[in-house]
Swiss-Prot record:
It comes from Elusimicrobium minutum (strain Pei191). Gene3D superfamilies: 1.10.1750.10, 1.10.8.60, 3.30.300.180, P-loop containing nucleotide triphosphate hydrolases. Domain I is involved in oligomerization and binding regulators, domain II is flexibile and of varying length in different bacteria, domain III forms the AAA+ region, while domain IV binds dsDNA. It comes from the Bacteria. Residues 75-110 are annotated as: Domain II. ATP binds at G156, G158, K159, T160. This is Chromosomal replication initiator protein DnaA. Residues 111-327 are annotated as: Domain III, AAA+ region. The lineage of its organism: Bacteria, Pseudomonadati, Elusimicrobiota, Elusimicrobia, Elusimicrobiales.
Length: 452
């Protein structure tokens, strides 16, 4: 193996990790790490002592696997912490302020990504309320009418960007504000780590002394009883101290399945949904990414991508990166025919997704299970009806661009019933290969019907 990780290999690994964890997570947790390889030992240098080794390890294990595949052979992981080699110099303090009460101010390690700002966020009809609410939080930090702020959406629509933008704007106005960004998964991991180290008080002191707590993907805390309880007490401590709390989720507070006391707290502030961006917003997002990245891509190609990819901003930007990388490697200028070829798998999948009609789903599933179509909307709850209904609702979440409430209305059920059906069928598919094959056959039949 090479003694160091060369730049090409590092870039390839980073791109691969972005497909696994997403661009935002890699920017926050992977890029700040320094990696070197010597004598089959991958040394991972954490940027400071506050960095969670538990969280970093999740990303590093994937990097390790990627390097082993790339170069062959097993490697070991060793962790280190970056030391500040700058010689210590006592700060010059006027004699009148020196003494026992003197405390030098040190910026709090916020974990924020400085690239995510309000200025870099494209506002549109789909996200306007969430964007304006985020700005209001900064102007009236900790005020009851804006606290907490909960932003929810499907993945890849900009929730994390807004979280970081809030923190970065606060720090711009007050560099010594105690801001902390973390995911729900990280909260759980650090809490467990504090229990294992028999030092939960340090964990509580850290999280309950903040000026602003920014938590991404709170749904990861749900279902973990002791972590939910710890977060509830942390929430109360911050809320009663008039400190700001901003949370994101992939579902509404009512759908989280958490302690009703906490759910009630989350609903007491502002709850805002980010929907899929419309065509104009998608074009604006791609133009901004093109201009900031200095990509040579014409507006006609930008419009083609924006029209063909509607699922998420993350996927939009990923398509732009894929196209420009392909064109750079082959020395060609991006055109619509080239974009159509390079992005055919994504755009064709998106087109198929948007073409599926919920009536086609009902028709095929009812025929497969030998029930009447009207049974999907009936009040009957016996297994012979409820099971096909759950399958049909699951397929509607997978094969259409309908929102959960829209699917609920299609089946005359509420969105929580749709969520339950989706999770139940997903679990069954994962655990039963025969059932998974059955679902795949139903999907093929639905697509065949929809083409007629």
């Amino acid at each position: 193996m090479n003694n160091i990780i060369n730049e090409d290999l590092k870039n390839r690994i980073l791109k691969e990790m972005e497909t696994v964890f997403g661009v935002e997570a890699c920017e926050t947790w992977l890029k700040p790490l320094s990696l070197s390889l010597k004598n089959d030992i991958l040394t991972v240098t954490l940027p400071n002592k506050f960095w969670s080794k538990t969280i970093a390890d999740k990303y590093v294990q994937e990097v390790k696997s990627s390097i082993e595949k790339e170069q062959g052979g097993d490697i070991q992981i060793k962790y280190d912490v970056l030391e500040d080699t700058t010689p210590y110099k006592r700060p010059e303090i006027p004699p009148q302020v020196m003494g026992a009460n003197y405390n030098a101010k040190i910026p709090f390690p916020s974990r924020l990504n400085p690239n995510y700002t309000f200025e870099g966020f494209i506002e549109g009809p789909s996200n306007r309320f969430a964007y304006r609410a985020a700005e209001a939080v900064v102007k009236k930090l900790g005020e009851r009418e804006n606290n907490p702020l909960v932003i929810y959406s499907t993945p890849g629509l900009g929730k994390t960007h807004l979280l970081h933008a809030i923190g970065n704007r606060i720090l711009k106005e007050n560099p010594y504000a105690k801001i902390l960004y973390m995911s729900g998964e990280e909260f759980v991991s650090e809490y467990i780590e504090s229990l294992q180290n028999r030092n939960p008080e340090a964990f509580r002191k850290k999280h309950r002394s903040l000026d602003c707590f920014l938590m991404d993907d709170i749904q990861f805390v749900a279902g973990k009883e002791s972590s939910v309880q710890e977060f509830f007490y942390t929430f109360n401590a911050l809320f009663e101290s008039k400190k700001q709390i901003v949370l994101t989720s992939d579902r509404t507070p009512q759908q989280l399945g958490i302690d009703p006391r906490l759910s009630s707290r989350l609903l007491s502030g502002i709850v805002s949904e980010i929907k899929r961006p419309d065509l104009e917003t998608r074009i604006a997002i791609l133009r901004q990414k093109r201009d900031t990245s200095n990509f040579d891509v014409g507006d006609d190609v930008i419009a083609f991508i924006a029209e063909g990819v509607q699922a998420s901003i993350r996927e939009l930007e990923g398509c732009l990166f894929r196209l420009t990388t392909y064109c750079n490697i082959h020395g060609v200028t991006p055109t619509i025919p080239i974009a159509r070829e390079v992005l055919s798998d994504i755009i064709s999948m998106e087109e198929k997704r948007l073409l599926i009609n919920p009536n086609s789903i009902k028709k095929v599933v009812s025929k497969h299970f030998k029930i009447d179509i009207i049974d999907f909307n009936s009040k009957r709850k016996n297994h012979s009806i409820a099971w096909p209904r759950q399958i049909a609702m699951y397929l509607a979440t997978e094969l259409t661009d309908m929102s959960l409430p829209e699917i609920g209305r299609e089946f005359e059920r509420d969105h929580s019933t749709v969520v339950h059906a989706r999770e139940k069928i997903k679990e069954e598919i994962e655990n039963d290969p025969f059932f998974a094959a059955q679902i795949n056959q139903i999907i093929s039949d639905i697509k065949a019907v929809d083409k007629r």
